[in-house]
């Protein structure tokens, strides 16, 4: 059994779920899985994956786990009560071997957003662990050696250069994830600020970290009053739910240009900062700082969070480039939790529909978008004033 607790997921799944409960409990959504790594035959392990999903759907939160969630300042009593009764339902999930693409799997999730939002992260962790335990021998000593070198590199930096673990969805295994976190905590001290994983935050006394994911802003392409106003509607909704708490805005759902047009003086003052998750991070940071300054907001009072494919070398270069012009935070994922030798999988589960309408992410990095509807992608680009997409190519890859 790979997943032992419903807390073994990223915090932002719970923070988004709370907002969904309070504001959009009837929303219906579709998610779709995609493996971007070529030549990966997941279909051969489909029965094993299915058994792990069955086990996941039998889990409920224990009383001490609900109490832990209640202890978080931003979790409201009614949401904790709801979670005490919650479980994932297999009826919302369909898993099959792909007939069109031998070796691939087709994994879709369809149902109420409130009841499906917690599927994504544990499903990705299950698929990763099933793959690696069947295709590689773990070299934990190599992983420890690499981790020690990363700790040494970070400790050579100023104390303000701090990282967090964001690696649940692409980890090598639950066991390795659980081993490396106390090593980081003890090795880095205050340079290790916490983890996105709620289960391990509880177990090791770490700070759980996270605010919102792409799906939250994507959903408002269908939930908001107008498509053009969808980002503003999503950010306003977040502000209503958290009243200034959890104030990191995600900037790349329809690209940085469109985001900055919507992120006006009100949002610049209200939110604590912004998160980078695609595109060139140095260019992104310079543009965000310039945007804040243009709105007479001191960037030194705001946090720039970097979380796109970071390794320790990139963390150090970003810190040296931007410090002390702003506050900085770094969420490191695969480079921490899946660096034992074997090549990590590039797998994702993305929302593709909400209330029957297509939704999409127009990433600042080519290849990171997923959408089933080419016409909608063109329309979305036009509405937000983005360059037309190329005529050729797979729309799911933009």
Curated annotation (Swiss-Prot):
Processing after translation: Transiently phosphorylated on a His residue during the reaction cycle. Phosphorylation strongly increases the affinity for substrates and increases the rate of nicotinate D-ribonucleotide production. Dephosphorylation regenerates the low-affinity form of the enzyme, leading to product release.
GO cellular-component term (any): cytosol
NCBIfam families attached to this UniProt entry: NAPRTase, PRK05321.1
Example GO molecular function: nicotinate phosphoribosyltransferase activity
InterPro entries: N/Namide_PRibTrfase, NAPRTase_N, Nic_PRibTrfase, Nic_PRibTrfase-Fam, Nicotinate_pribotase-like_C
Family, per entry: Belongs to the NAPRTase family.
Enzyme class: ligase
Entries under CDD domains matching the protein: PncB_like (cd01401)
Protein name (database record): Nicotinate phosphoribosyltransferase
Keywords attached to this entry: Ligase, Phosphoprotein, Pyridine nucleotide biosynthesis
SUPFAM superfamilies per the UniProt record, alphabetical: Nicotinate/Quinolinate PRTase C-terminal domain-like (SSF51690), Nicotinate/Quinolinate PRTase N-terminal domain-like (SSF54675)
EC numbers, comma separated: 6.3.4.21
UniProt cross-references to HAMAP family, sorted A to Z: NAPRTase
One BP term from GO: NAD biosynthetic process via the salvage pathway
Gene3D superfamilies given in the database record: nicotinate phosphoribosyltransferase
Residues that bear Phosphohistidine: 214
Biological or metabolic pathway of the protein: Cofactor biosynthesis; NAD(+) biosynthesis; nicotinate D-ribonucleotide from nicotinate: step 1/1
Catalysed transformations (reactions): nicotinate + 5-phospho-alpha-D-ribose 1-diphosphate + ATP + H2O = nicotinate beta-D-ribonucleotide + ADP + phosphate + diphosphate
Function: Catalyzes the synthesis of beta-nicotinate D-ribonucleotide from nicotinate and 5-phospho-D-ribose 1-phosphate at the expense of ATP.
């Amino acid at each position: 059994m790979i997943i032992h607790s419903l807390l073994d997921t990223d915090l932002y799944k719970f923070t988004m779920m709370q907002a969904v409960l309070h504001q959009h409990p009837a929303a219906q959504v579709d998610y779709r899985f995609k493996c971007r790594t070529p030549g990966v035959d997941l279909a051969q392990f489909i029965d094993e994956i299915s058994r792990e999903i069955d086990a996941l759907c039998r889990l409920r939160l224990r009383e001490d786990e609900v109490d832990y969630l209640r202890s978080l300042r931003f979790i409201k009593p009614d949401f904790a009560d709801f979670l005490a009764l919650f479980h994932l339902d297999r009826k919302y999930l369909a898993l099959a071997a792909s007939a069109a693409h031998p070796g691939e799997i087709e994994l879709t999730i369809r149902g109420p957003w409130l009841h499906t939002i917690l599927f994504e992260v544990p499903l990705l962790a299950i698929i990763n662990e099933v793959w690696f335990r069947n295709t590689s021998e773990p070299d934990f000593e190599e992983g420890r050696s690499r981790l020690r070198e990363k700790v040494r590199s970070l400790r050579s930096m100023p104390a303000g250069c701090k990282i967090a673990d964001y690696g649940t969805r692409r980890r090598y295994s639950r066991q390795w994830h659980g081993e490396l976190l106390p090593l980081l905590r003890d090795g880095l001290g205050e340079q290790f600020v916490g983890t996105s994983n709620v289960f391990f935050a509880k177990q090791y006394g770490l700070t759980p970290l996270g605010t919102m994911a792409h799906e939250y802003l994507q959903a408002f392409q269908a939930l908001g009053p107008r498509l053009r106003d969808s980002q503003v509607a999503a950010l306003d909704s977040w502000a209503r739910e958290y009243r200034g708490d959890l104030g990191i805005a995600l900037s790349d759902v329809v690209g940085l240009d469109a985001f900055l047009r919507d992120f006006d003086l009100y949002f610049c003052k209200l939110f604590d900062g912004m998160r980078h998750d695609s595109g060139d991070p140095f260019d992104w940071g310079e543009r965000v700082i310039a945007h804040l300054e243009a709105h007479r907001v001191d960037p030194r009072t705001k946090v720039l969070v970097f979380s796109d494919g970071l390794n320790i070398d990139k963390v150090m270069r970003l810190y040296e480039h931007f410090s002390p012009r702003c506050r900085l935070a770094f969420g490191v994922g695969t480079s921490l939790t899946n660096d034992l030798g074997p090549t990590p999988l590039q797998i994702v589960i993305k929302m593709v529909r909400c209330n029957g309408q297509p939704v999409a992410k127009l990433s600042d990095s080519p290849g990171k978008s997923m959408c089933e509807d080419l016409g909608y992608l063109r329309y979305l680009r036009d509405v937000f004033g983005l360059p037309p997409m190329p005529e050729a190519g797979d729309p799911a890859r933009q």
